[in-house]
């Protein structure tokens, strides 16, 4: 039995690299698809947003001399590549999946709108929402917050390479301690980098809770969905 009926799963592009330095690791992709299938089999309605940092980051491109708008557009295209890859992996695992894009690029994906996304999820498809918000200067964290609010998700699950939110970076500070749950006000007060400020404030204002957890440990996604205390819960 799943704790949540409809979720927004946010995946980082970097996590798709696995052990590689760039691009997509097929083993990691298959592991993610298998984990998503596990919760799909529980009857959960699933929307997904994936970053593009394993291929290109608009902000880092701007720091290297790219026009920021063009750099962000390249980043949006990177998220589409990742979304198509995950869609293919899900189909191979026996799960119906559909890619929606925030900018028109048929036949690569359908143009996104809330009602189409919900219709597809209610029909049992995993919906992967790509190209961010379709606008420059917005991160995929902000895009995932927006989509989670739009599709009326019960929770956003932020799958990362760490097992939750800490008082400091545990890789740099051995005294850092993990939060099992924390309020949005405390996140903002402490300046914790759960997501960028815009994304965090959107979730707070629209009462969308976030669970930050380690997606790279196989089985964790299902454990979260079954109510186990994995990761950190952020709430009002």
Q: What are the language-model segments listed below?
A:
Residues 1-236:
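C-terminal catalytic "cap/lid" subdomain
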């Amino acid at each position: 039995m799943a704790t949540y009926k409809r979720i927004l799963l946010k995946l980082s592009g970097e996590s798709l690299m696995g052990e590689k330095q760039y691009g997509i690791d097929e083993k990691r992709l298959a592991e993610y698809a298998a984990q998503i299938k596990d919760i799909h089999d529980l009857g959960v309605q699933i929307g997904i947003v994936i970053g593009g940092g394993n291929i290109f980051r608009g902000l880092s491109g701007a720091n290297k001399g790219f026009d920021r708008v063009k750099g962000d557009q390249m980043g949006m295209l990177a998220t589409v590549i990742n979304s198509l890859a995950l869609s293919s992996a899900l189909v191979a695992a026996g799960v119906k999946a559909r890619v929606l894009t925030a900018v028109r690029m048929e036949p690569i994906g359908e143009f996104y709108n809330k009602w189409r996304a919900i219709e597809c999820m209610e029909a049992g498809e995993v919906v992967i929402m790509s190209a961010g918000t379709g606008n420059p200067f917005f991160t995929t964290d902000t895009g995932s917050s927006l989509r989670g609010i739009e599709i009326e998700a019960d929770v956003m699950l932020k799958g990362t390479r760490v097992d939750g939110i800490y008082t400091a970076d545990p890789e740099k500070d051995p005294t850092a301690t993990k939060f099992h749950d924390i309020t949005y006000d405390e996140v903002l007060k402490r300046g914790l980098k759960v997501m960028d400020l815009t994304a965090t404030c959107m979730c707070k204002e629209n009462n969308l809770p976030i669970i930050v957890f380690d997606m790279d440990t196989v089985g964790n996604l299902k454990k979260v969905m079954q109510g186990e205390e994995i990761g950190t819960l952020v709430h009002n």
